[in-house]
Each structure stands twice: as C-alpha cells, then as structure tokens.
Regions:
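Solvent-exposed helix-loop boundary motif
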Residues: 21-117, 121, 125-167, 183-188, ...
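A short beta-strand element within beta-rich, extracytoplasmic domains
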Residues: 480-504, 508-516, 576-586, 597, ...
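A conserved hydrophobic secondary-structure block that centers on an alpha-helix together
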Residues: 323-348, 554-593, 604, 762, ...
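Extended surface/linker regions that mediate inter-domain or inter-protein docking
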Residues: 214-360, 366-367, 371, 487-489, ...
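Primarily short, surface-exposed interaction patches in extracytoplasmic proteins
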Residues: 155-188, 192, 196-227, 242-291, ...
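Bacterial N-terminal signal peptides
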Residues: 1-15
Length: 1010
C-alpha cells in the first residue's frame, strides 16, 4: 500500500536500481507554478488513482491537505522545501524497489520529475483556487435517499403542507396570516393556473357560492382548461431556454421549432406522468416508439442556442469545429441535468466540481451520451397508423427490387395476374412513350462506381465524393427528341433505400445537360417532377446556378422521376449518340444512387409517371405470347406502381427542430455515422484529451450505477434511453425533489429551495426540508401527476393566505405580531403570509387582450411573428416590432404563441423581464423598473388595447360611470369604491375613455397578484 510504504521510508534514504537522478541539464522556469506546471502532470498521470473517483491508500493529489499529509498514514508525503526527503518524489522517480508511480501508463519524464522537484523545493505553493474539496455525498441533503417523512401533528392544520409550514412557524413564534378574500383567491388562482384574469361572471359565481367545495370545483375547472397547458408550457420553455432562432452571430430562424412548444402544451393539458414527460424529452424515439407524435418532445435537447458559423460553416476537421461540438453537447447535458436534477454538472467541464461531488469524469460521461446527435430538422409521422403503413410499404418496395421465390409465386399467381390484366385494360394508362438508351455507359468524374443493371439503370457504389458529375452516354433509334426523363430509383443498397446516396437517402441534382451528337447543349424549356423538396424544386436543376438543386427529402426510400422538355424538338444525328450529364455540385454526398435515362419523341407537354421501355415492349405483345419473366416484370411494375402511389398518397412527414442523427445535411453539418468518441479533456482543453469517456451519469447517486452497460454497435439513441431511465428511476432522489420544488416556485414566487436549478453547496438549502421530501416522495409514489401536485399545493391554507396583514390579524394585535414576523422572517421564507408578485410579461399582455375583448384563443401551429421582417446584410434578418400590425390575426393570440427571437427580442416583453432564450431561466427576474413604467405608458400595444377596451365599454354600457365600473371589474376583478368611481369618471370625461383605460392598465392592482 502506498501510504504504508511512505510511512516506512520517512527520514530513511532509499536507493534502487530503478531510481533516476536529477538531470541538472534540464532547463526550468525561474518559478514553477502549481496551476500551470504541476497540476497538469498530476491530472494526466496521478488523478485516476488518487483523485475524486478513486483514492488508493486514501491518498489524493487533487486536495492540498491530503496531498501534503499522505493519506491513511497521515505521514507527510510532500515536505515543502525538501524534495529529497519527500516520499512523493521517491515513488515517482522509482527510488522504492518494485514501486514506480504511476503504476499504469508511462513513467514521468525527466522534465516532469524536475518540475515537481523544483515545485517542492520552492515550498510546494498550492493556491486555494486550485484546491479540490472533499465532499461526503452522503451528508448533502439533495443526495440523501428520498423517504416519505412523517407529517407533524399540528393543531388546526388539516392539510399536510400546512402541518409542515406551521411547525416551522411555531419554532419562531409566528402565526399564519388570515385567509385571502374570495376575489383575491380566484384572481390569484386563475393567473397561477391558466395565466389569465377571471371574468366578472366567473368572479360573481365563485364569490356567491356558499358551498365549502366551491374552491375545489374552481381548482378542478381551471386545471381542466386548455389554457392551463399554455400557461405551464411557458414556464418550461423558460427552463429549457427555448427560442426559434439559433442565436450567436448568425441568428437564423428555426422554421420548425414550434412543434416542441405544442408538445409541451399538450403534455401539460394531458397531465402526462412526469417520468414519461422526462423520458419523452430525452429519448422519445426509443421510449415512446408507440407514440410517434412524441418525437416533437426531442425539441427539448435542441431548444438552446446553436453556433451556426462554427457547426455548419467551417470545415469538419478543424479544432474550432471540435470545440463547437463540445460546447454544443455541453448545452444539451446542462439543459437535461439542470432541469431534471437541479445540479450544476457543467461546472465539472474543466476540472472536478469544486463544491459538489461531481468529478470531471462524470461530466464527460454525460457528453458521451449525446455524442451521436446534432440539432437539425427531424422528420416524423405523428400518426402511428401512417407510420406503420409507410414502413410496410417501404418494406414491400424493397422486396420488389429483388423478388424472392415466395414473392415470385405471389406475383405470378392468379390474383396478381388478374390485377395486371385489369390495369392493362384500364383507361388510366400513361400516354407518353419513353425509350431507354441503347448500349448505355456511365462514368463518374468524382470517383463513384456506376454499375449497369439489366433494367437500364446504373447503381452507384464505392467511394462517395463530395461532388460528382455522372456522364451517361448511349444511342437511340429515335430521329427527333422532345424531352428526356430522369428516373432516380430506390435500391436496398442505398442509405434509407435511396434514391440518393446521402445518409438520409436524399440527392441534389444541380444541373442537367443534354448533347446530341455534338458539344452543343440542347436548351431545356420546362421541367416537372413527381415531388419537390421545399426550396429545392426541379426548376433549380435548369436555372444555370450550381448552388441550387433539385431534392426529394423527406420522401426518401421511393423512386422519383423528373421530365425535362426541350425548347423545341431536337434532331438526333445519324449515329444516334446521346450524352447526358448529371451535375451534382451541392456537396455533402448528395449524389444520385441509381439513375436511369430515357427519351421521348411524343408531342409536348410531357408528364412524369410514364411507362418504362421494357414495360412498353411487353405491352406490345399478346398476353399469351409473354414469357414467365415478362409476366413477372409486368406484375412487379404494376405492384411497384401501386406501392409508389400509396406512399405518395400518405401525408408528408412533419418536421421538428430537435436532436437527431438523421437529417438533411446543411453546409458542412452532416449526420454523424455513429456516436463520436469522447475524451476527458484536461482543463477542458480540446488539445489535451486523456482517457476515453464511457456513457453514463453521476456517481454521487449511490443507488444507481454511474456508467451504462451498453452493447457494442447500438444506435446512439440507446445512450439517451439509458440516461432517461436513470433520471426517472425511483431511487434517484434528485429528479423528484427538483420537479416539486420547481412547481412550488411558480406558485409561491420562490421555491422551498431558492436556487431552483442548483441543489448543490453553492445553492440555498431548503427552508422546509421535510415538506420538500414529503411532496417529492408522495409525488413519485402516487402516479407523478403534476395536476395532482398543483391541487395539493393550492388547496392548502398556506397557499390561500392573504399576502398583506390587516388590522384584524391576531385579534387586533396587528402591529406587534407583524413587526415580529418581519423582524424574524423578513423575506417570508417561512411563509407566514403569501408573497405578492408582479405579473410576468405574458400575463400582462394576455390580460390586456382579455380585458379589451381582443384575445384569440386559437391554439397551436406556427408561431406568430409580431414584427416586420426583412433580409439582413448577412444571416440575421432585420426585425422591426414597431411596424407590426397589432390588429392583425397574428397579434391577438396568447403570448405563448409569439415567435421568440434570441438576439432581437420584443422590447416591450423584454422590459417586463421576459427571457430571450439565450440562457436557461428557471426563475425570472421580477423587477420593477423605470423601463417598465415607460413601456406600460407608451408602448403601442398598451395604447392599442386601451382603445379596444374603450370601444368595448361603449358597446356594453351607456354612461361614463357604468363604463368605468365595468372597466375596473374587467381589469382588477372588483367594483370601484365611491371615491374611485367619482375620480375615474371625471378623468374619463376630461381626458377620454381610452386614456382612463391606459391608466387602469398601469395600476398596481392590474400589474400585481396579491
């Protein structure tokens, strides 16, 4: 054992045949720095066995006190100013027989030994900033096993939450505030659960209902409202730092980010159990495979900013690109671990966490979980029936490519041949006749291998160059040609069955050129295709621009065809020579996998979906004269046409911007072939990789394994699935404490733990630890219903307290009691009253729209771009919020449907502390600033809604006093008192009803919840 030997050797000179003397010729700096010179040696050679994860002989070289003292023996191992007698030097230089450290790997070099020796002789200075911390994970509250605590017995407390809260109040000699009045309660509850003010009718009904169950019915009604999902999805969007642009210097719009928002709204409205909610957002493609519409949940992993210039625009093999990937994965893992475990795992990126038991190895184990995904548009079928049908049809199409014995028998059978006869006799036969090239050959200028197949097509294989041009040459017996047909055929040897060679099956045809017996290119007047990828239409293959092209994504795995009609019939020379060049210049391997060329002399217009030459030849024969192979060819064609039509009839797959390993490449961003190797980086430096990371999670959760056991060759999604299971394991105490604290925070404006996303030593401790554990354990063990958790919280007397203390409190002893409470618990951590809080930006905007009668409750779909948009000088567009038509349809929906622009946020919403999505925001700032006052008084949105409210008041009431009374009821939920009615009416008469409405929107009662 290392420490025993150290103890023995103290003060005793030891010699060994393996010992290395000091090489005085080595040049060293005048002063040796621990951080710059010594610590990197320890991290590279020693920390694996003597660090936070493993401490052989209880010795550590990352904690100063242990490094100096010598571990278990407590005998000094590093003697400052005396390297000769320091046992550490004896071991690393081989001065102990049979004991040369490190025991694994290369011995330290003479240079490294000289550095350590000089550092010790200088006094072994070790700054506090570089000193590790010994953390006993079992002692820290958030890592302790989650066990349901006993509910304390409290007189008058009929609810578990009240029992826990009042026990704490009793300890400090405090009393709870009296209940809030019913108007305050319904307004508080309505904004909390659905983010909208109650209507006067709803208030009247609740206030007048004498039934003690009236409050419970109100809670149930609000939780059942579709508005609930909209309100609570917005909270989660803050936490996930969701926005609809990339951010950074190239703030490109994400056209398909919004399905994730709609997923959240649906998940909250459906009360998705929390374990499933977590699993869907981390690994829906594996753990919710029976519900393909849940693929949109993977938008969570891609919700944050993305550096386009680094991850798309620069070369794959650069250091900057590799750094960008590590940073991108850092955002993904931070999003997951901060929001589901409330730990700052990202602080272990460059070194072991300084305060929490999270070693750097755990951080990179989580990096390895996301090593196989990128952020991109991911296609999916939301309908499981459509998905299964698409899969079955693709499988059938693949089988038809090379029919086996059983399929041959089926196709030559009576039923199949009857279908052929019916098809042949039908009037739906295609009219254009196409003839394949004879004696055709194909060459690739880029290095692809093009193999001729019996059907006249060429199958590409072998090398897949970035760019390529296929030169297909042949002869034709036609004398005049009106157009050319390019078929791009599916094949099981191609990615996703093709028809392209890109990993996702796509292709990009940049230009097509046809020459007939000379070098003169035949002009093409018109092009048509059976399918065009958005923004990659077939006309782009004849526009003369190499940067544009025809594509077919997401309809991959299908044959496609394009028709190119000549400007006028072209004469074929006597030798019949035809040359077609298929230029594929977009890059990233967007190459055609199996092309086939045919010609027609029919009169224009020519149309896609016409008969192949071999089928035309067979149809010219009498059925009785056809051979078995010809009958099979015809049956295969008819069945393939049926399958192709069925596939084309299916809805186009939807797209969501999400984590994916299969997507349409952009620039240098391509689907990864598999999970990339992840190495621990010494000090977080990409140039200093050390050991290979194994996918896993956190070792500090004792009940669960820290590394995942995965078979070799599994898809990257298996890693995410294991992480999702780790997160939702009942033995993981972090997940359940985190979510109940998060929900509590949004009801009380602060969590039981103030730092919602930091349950570590730099975060705050819980104000009511037993209550937190009771809520978490009960939530975990009772179905994990978030709606049930809401119900439990808002039905407590603690939630229903008044936010301010009136004269009636404690039998008129208001002064002494409240002064004592403010003195003992100034910031109300013990909840002796309810918190008063300002409405968030969305609630302010939505409340104005609801009050004015302009709110549109249409749900879902693409986000509302409440700005004027023009192209910018570079990627980021020019945004002008002032030019937006506030009365247009895009200006009336709830704020959760606003388009969120990262670098160019809405100034009005920003003034009210609405986050821009650039950072994870578990808790918003709740400020009161001059900017807010100016925004609420001058912004065009406020002015417009004040005008609309005035119009509503004029329509619904006839006198100024009645209009003022209704306005106050709509805005703050109560009748004005006599003085208010007189003053407001005079103001409305003097300055106009719109100005009075404007004032009303600026009152504290409108802006705050009591």
């Amino acid at each position: 054992m290392l420490t025993i030997l150290i103890f023995v050797t103290i003060g005793t000179p030891i010699t060994s045949s393996t010992a290395r003397a000091c090489d005085e010729s080595i040049e060293l700096p005048k002063t040796t720095s621990f951080v710059e010179d010594v610590q990197p040696i320890f991290e590279a050679a020693c920390i694996a066995c003597h660090g936070p994860l493993r401490q052989e002989s209880e010795y550590r070289l990352d904690v100063r006190e242990v490094a100096l003292s010598g571990g278990a023996s407590s005998a000094p191992n590093i003697i400052p100013h005396n390297a000769v007698d320091s046992p550490l030097m004896h071991f690393v230089s081989g001065q102990v027989d049979g004991m040369l450290m490190p025991s694994k790997g290369k011995p330290l070099s003479d240079q490294q030994l000289a550095v350590i020796r000089k550092w010790i002789d200088q006094g072994a200075p070790w700054p506090d900033s570089a000193n590790g911390v010994i953390v006993d994970k079992g002692e820290w509250w958030s890592l302790k096993p989650l066990i349901l605590p006993h509910v304390p017995e409290q007189t008058g407390a009929h609810h578990p939450i009240d029992a826990f809260v009042r026990a704490k109040l009793d300890e400090q000699g405090l009393l709870p505030a009296p209940p809030a009045d019913r108007i305050t309660l319904i307004r508080r509850l309505s904004f909390d659960l659905i983010g909208l003010p109650p209507t006067p009718e709803e208030i009247d009904t609740f206030v007048a209902d004498p039934d003690t169950a009236a409050y419970q019915r109100l809670v149930d009604r609000l939780l059942a409202s579709p508005r609930y999902g909209e309100r609570w999805a917005r909270h989660w969007m803050d936490a996930a730092h969701f926005a609809e642009t990339h951010g950074h210097d190239q703030d490109r719009i994400r056209e398909n980010a919004w399905p994730y928002r709609d997923y959240l709204i649906e998940a909250f409205n459906d009360d998705t159990p929390f374990n499933r909610f977590v699993r869907e957002q981390v690994a829906a493609d594996v753990l919710a495979a029976d519900s393909p519409n849940k693929i949109a949940a993977l938008g969570f992993l891609a919700a944050g900013p993305w550096d386009e210039s680094t991850l798309r625009d620069i070369r794959e093999d650069t250091i900057d690109r590799e750094i960008g990937r590590y940073v991108d994965r850092d955002d993904m893992l931070t999003n997951v671990m901060s929001n589901f475990t409330s730990l700052t795992v990202h602080c272990a990126r460059c070194h072991d966490h300084k305060f929490d038991p999270i070693p750097q190895a755990d951080y990179y184990a989580l990096q390895a979980v996301f090593a196989g995904v990128e952020r991109a548009n991911r296609s999916y079928d939301p309908d499981v029936t459509v998905l299964k049908l698409r899969e079955a049809l693709r499988k059938r199409a693949e089988q038809l490519t090379a029919p086996d014995t059983q399929l041959r028998q089926e196709l030559l059978g009576t039923k199949s041949q009857q279908l052929v006869a019916e098809w042949e006799a039908s009037s739906e036969r295609h009219l254009t006749v196409w003839q394949s090239l004879e004696n055709a050959t194909a060459e690739s200028t880029g290095g692809s291998t093009l193999t001729a197949l019996p059907d006249g097509s060429f199958l590409a294989s072998g090398a897949r160059p970035e760019l390529d041009t296929y030169v297909i040459a042949g002869r034709s017996k036609l004398t005049s040609v009106t157009g050319i047909r390019l078929e791009v055929l599916a094949d099981p040897s191609l990615p996703n069955s093709g028809p392209g060679r890109q990993n996702n099956g796509n292709l990009h045809l940049s230009e097509i050129e046809v020459t007939l017996g000379s070098d003169k290119i035949v002009p093409i007047a018109r092009a048509a295709a059976d399918f065009d990828q958005a923004e990659w239409e077939i006309v782009r293959a004849i526009d003369g621009k190499p940067e544009t092209a025809w594509g077919i994504y997401p309809k991959v795995g299908l044959p496609h065809e394009a028709i190119f009609e000549f400007a006028e019939p072209a004469q074929i020379p006597t030798d019949g020579k035809v040359i077609v060049r298929l230029k594929q210049l977009h890059g990233t391997g967007h190459l055609i996998g199996r092309p086939r060329i045919s010609l027609s002399s029919d009169k224009p217009p020519l149309a896609p979906d016409n008969l192949p030459t071999e089928v035309t030849a067979i149809l010219a024969m009498e059925p009785a004269a056809r051979s078995e192979e010809q009958r099979l060819t015809l049956a295969v064609y008819v069945e393939r046409e049926r399958v192709t039509r069925a596939l084309r009839a299916l809805p186009t797959p939807k797209l969501v911007y999400a984590a994916t390993a299969d997507f349409e490449p952009e620039g240098s961003l391509k689907p990864p072939p598999g999970p990339r190797p992840i190495h621990l980086l010494a000090r977080g430096d990409i140039r200093s990789p050390t050991e290979l990371a194994v996918p896993g999670a956190l070792a500090c959760v004792d009940a669960l394994p820290a590394r995942f056991e995965l078979e070799a060759g599994l898809q990257e999604s298996a890693r995410r699935a294991e992480l999702a299971k780790w997160l939702t394991d009942a033995r993981n105490p972090l997940t359940w404490r985190s979510i109940v604290n998060r929900i509590w925070h949004h009801h009380f404006s602060r969590g039981i733990v103030d730092t919602v996303n930091d349950f570590g030593r730099l975060g705050s401790k819980p104000s009511h630890p037993e209550l937190l554990d009771w809520l978490a354990a009960d939530f975990r063990d009772s179905g994990q219903s978030i709606k049930a958790l809401h119900r439990k919280i808002v039905t407590s007397e603690t939630y229903r307290q008044a936010s301010h203390v009136g004269e009636c409190w404690c039998d008129g002893q208001r002064g002494a009691r409240s002064d004592h409470a403010h003195r003992v618990d100034t910031d109300n951590r013990l909840l002796w009253r309810m918190h008063r809080t300002r409405l968030d930006a969305e609630c302010v905007r939505d409340a104005m729209l609801a009050t004015s009668g302009q709110l549109d409750l249409h749900m879902g779909g693409m986000s509302d771009r409440q700005f004027d948009l023009k192209p910018g000088r570079h990627v980021t567009p020019i945004i002008d919020y002032a030019m937006f038509d506030l009365d247009g349809p895009a200006g009336q929906r709830r704020s959760v449907y606003r388009f969120l622009f990262r670098t160019l946020p809405d100034p009005f919403m920003e003034a009210l502390d609405c986050p821009a999505g650039d950072q994870i925001t578990p808790a918003r700032t709740n400020s009161v600033t001059v900017q807010q006052v100016l925004a609420m008084w001058n912004d065009s949105l406020v002015l417009k809604q004040a005008e609309h409210l005035a119009v509503r008041l004029r329509l619904e009431r006839n006198t100024t006093r009645d209009r003022v009374s209704l306005a106050v009821r709509l805005a703050v939920g109560r009748e004005p008192n006599a003085a208010e009615l007189d003053g407001f009416s005079k103001y409305a008469d003097d300055y106009g009803l719109p100005n009075f409405c404007r004032v009303l929107f600026n009152t504290n009662e409108f802006m705050f919840i009591d």
